[in-house]
Each structure stands twice: as structure tokens, then as C-alpha cells.
From Swiss-Prot:
Pathway: Cell wall biogenesis; peptidoglycan biosynthesis. The keyword Isomerase applies. Pfam families: Asp_Glu_race. This is Glutamate racemase. InterPro entries: Asp/Glu/hydantoin_racemase (IPR015942), Asp/Glu_race (IPR001920), Asp/Glu_racemase_AS_1 (IPR018187), Glu_race (IPR004391). Keywords: Cell shape, Cell wall biogenesis/degradation, Isomerase, Peptidoglycan synthesis. It catalyses: L-glutamate = D-glutamate. It is an enzyme of class 5 (isomerase). The active site is at 75 (proton donor/acceptor), 186 (proton donor/acceptor). Substrate binds at residues 12-13, 44-45, 76-77, 187-188. The gene is murI.
Amino acid sequence: MSVKNNPIGVIDSGVGGISVLKEAVKQLPYENFIYYGDSKNAPYGIKSVDEVRNLTFNVVEKLLKLNIKALVVACNTATSAAIDELREKYKNIPVIGIEPALKPAVELKRRGKIIIMATPMTLSEVKFKNLMEKYEKDSEIVKLPCPGLVELIEDGIVEGEKMQEYLRNKFKDYEKDDIAAFVLGCTHYPFVKKEIASIARDVPIIDGSQGTVMQLKRKLDKYDILNIGSEKGKIKIMNSLKDDKILDLSHRLLDL
């Protein structure tokens, strides 16, 4: 059996990476995917770097036993904590991470602040500091840590009064006319894009899933393992939380 038919592993601290999986299925319809959410240990964003690194390696080892041909770390926090070490250890497969989509936000050239919504750990990591330094001469970039938001989404709260209240409280210090763009620096956050938009109105909201999947496509091509068959690929969803509710939520968010 050709390696091209082997699945692509997509991992996250919970259900957030489903937003990246969704984009991957759209752009790469003939690929097989295995998604693993580590909801038992979510959220990663309030843990130490070492803890996140260890959890990430544990998940990757599980997927390698299922013969994945490529790995997508669809979690900004895990990317910040472990991507270099993962690439160093698993040199035989492409390893793709995700980072906040600052570049497209800056390229909009809109007046006002670019607000980066992310977990506390992502925003405190050197990797993000370097990314911010690259663009802060062109734009005013504001870090907005969002502790508690991942937990709400993991509980299936992606709309309604509770979510609106959380977001309104987060945005209360900012004037809408003074915001150039929101950058969603966590793969969970695209699932509340509609709720953010209902408060922020015409402010662009950008996430990194499209760029990540384009990079995945380039790497599959480079390694000559891109599946260009005619049969639609299969998707398997796994979660460390052995709970039907979390699997149901995962499928609902995938919304295929």
C-alpha cells in the first residue's frame, strides 16, 4: 500500500484543532485524516512549557503507531512549546505547526490596533515575542490573553449569552473604531467567530488555519506523498477524554 494513502495526523489540546481539520478536508479532499484531541488535559494554555511539551509528545507517539505520513500541530500553545523539538525528533515526516496570523492582519493596512486573542502561554512564549517584533514597527499590536475561553468552547458553549458576556468583558477596554483587526491565536477561537463579529461588527477577524493547510499541502508535495486519488478521504476522530459528548461535539464542530 502506498504511503500516499496513509493518514495525516492532526493534534490539539482539545476540539480547537477541528477548525484546522475542517480547512484541511476542504483543501485536501482525497487525504485520510486522524484527529486527536487531548481534552482530558485541556487547556494547555495555562500549563508550563515542559508540561505542554510532554503532553504533545505523548499524543504524537500514539499517532505514529497509526502510521501517519505527516503531522499537523493544530494548537498554537503546543506549537510554541514543542514544534522545534518535534521536528528534531521526527525528521522522517513533515511536521507543520500553527502561529497567529499576524502577517495577513498587518497587510490589511487598516488604521488602529491589531488585537491578538490567544492563551496566556502562547502570548508569553519567545516564539510569539519574535513574531511580534517582526511586525510591530508596521502596526500597533495588542496582546489579549483569554483564559477561560478554551474551557467554554470545550463545554460546547460557542454561542449565546454566556459567550457574549465573556467576549464583551474582554473587549470593554477597546473602541471598535480603533481596532484594525482581530487575530485568533488559538485554534479553538474560530468557533466563536460569529459571536466576536456580532460585537465587533465590521472589524476583520483572521485565523491561521488557511495558511497552515497551504503549508501542509506544500510539504506533502515536496515529500511526494500528496494523495491525488479520486476517492474522498476518511476522517477518524479520537479524544483522550473517553466521553461520547466530546466526540459528538467534535463531529458537530466539523459540521461536514
